[in-house]
Amino acid sequence: MSELAAVPPGVDATKLSPARVYDYFLGGTNNFLVDRQAAEFLRTSIPDLVDALWANRGFHGRAAVWMARHGIRQFLDIGSGLPTQNNTHESVQKIDADARVVYVDNDPMVAAHAGALLDAAGTTAVILADLRDPDALLNHPDLLRLIDLAEPVGVLMTDVMHFVPDDDDPWGLVARYMAATVPGSYLGLSHGTTEKMPPRQSQAARDTADVWPRSRAQVARFFKGLELLAPYDGAEPAVTYVGLWGAEDPEAADSDGSRFFYCGVARRIGTAPRRG
């Protein structure tokens, strides 16, 4: 595969990017040699990883569509990554053509390719921002232009919080975003785990990128104070594996790769935040 014709401003083509590695695994072309080398090392070291990433992508789409079918018309997709198949706006606008989506990522490559996500109707925007600064993001003019925080929001944080170390309080960050929404909003979150991964594979993941896999109990903490939903018909409300959430046949969907990510969808309850 040849390199991109030009390196977008602010992009370091010599440093791997999780978004570009993910893009490569899903068949995209917005990646560089360093990303492909890392991806091939991971593919060899963790044979079920590609299955895991597709399972995670499937959860993202099912969660977004579920929210849209339950009345959510505005979405905040944090850690959105590069454009790929069935992007959030493409999925939810099949339910409501006027649904609005704001994509957020800290990789300049995402912003450079934002044109693929922007539509003539003006229902989508892409923001280059660090999720560790909720105040800056929640007050960004592009977010406020499309999202009315006085109305329910679908917050999607899939495959992103395991890149935030404990020292940055990832649980507090998620709580901050949800505290800015009104009751009736939803959180859809997935998070990498190594609980079902052999030690050698777990070490390979840590050697390749700065990543903090977490346990089921740790992932469940992201939903503290929210009303966790049942992941599929007949189940109790719980955090589960990405292949199972929303699956028509959970037993068939329970692949080894899907167990590399925990996930959940939860409803915001309680009182609305005070506005200045």
Language-model region placement:
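Class I S-adenosylmethionine-dependent transferase superfamily signal
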Residues: Y177-M178, F223
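A short SAM/SAH-binding and catalytic strip from SAM-dependent methyltransferases
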Residues: L131-R132, P141-W171, Y177
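Short alpha-helix
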Residues: A209-A235
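Core SAM-dependent methyltransferase catalytic element
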Residues: T240-G276
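Short, glycine-/aromatic-enriched active-site segment of Class I SAM-dependent methyltransferases
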Residues: T194-T208
